[in-house]
Amino acid sequence: TGTNSSIGQVAIGSSALTALTNGTENTAVGYQALSAEASDGTVANTALGFKAGLSINGAKESTMVGAWSCDALTSGTKNTAFGSSTLSTATTALNNTALGYNTMANVKAAVAVDGCVAIGYEALLGNSSNTTGINNTIAIGYHALNVLTTGAGNSAVGSWAGSATTTGGYNTAFGYKAMANAVTAASNIVIGYEA
């Protein structure tokens, strides 16, 4: 770990926590885990995996488990990311839970991503374009809301639920492939198999 005022750090792995100079209570396990030059606001983070939390600078109370998990995250608090490449391109994220391979992996935002829950393979995946305004969205299931780029307050539960929706807010889709063909949708309630 760094040499200034780092306190209570645990680092296991090549280059883990190497540049941290003023953080406290961080745990990094894996090659380059939590290895960015970090400010004294970097507190109580846990990063386990290859390049997990690689760019963290000032983040607090986040848990990242899996290769490349939160590797572009520079700031934010209280994120939980489990799985390879979870939340891997978001730079500012707050209060998010991402569980599963590539879950929320391509969410890039000009503003902070806040209050999202994504569970399942590539749930709420996003794309490499500028993703904005998806706050307070829930995506549970294989590919649920996986191309959403703009639209807050959505809830999709079920494999492929809302899987074609790129734009739209305040939708509720429940069931296998529910709302799977709607590219742009707002304020809908869709329940049932392929509804």
Go through the PLM ranges and name each one.
Residues T1-A195:
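Glycine- and small/polar-enriched repetitive beta-structure motifs of secreted/surface proteins
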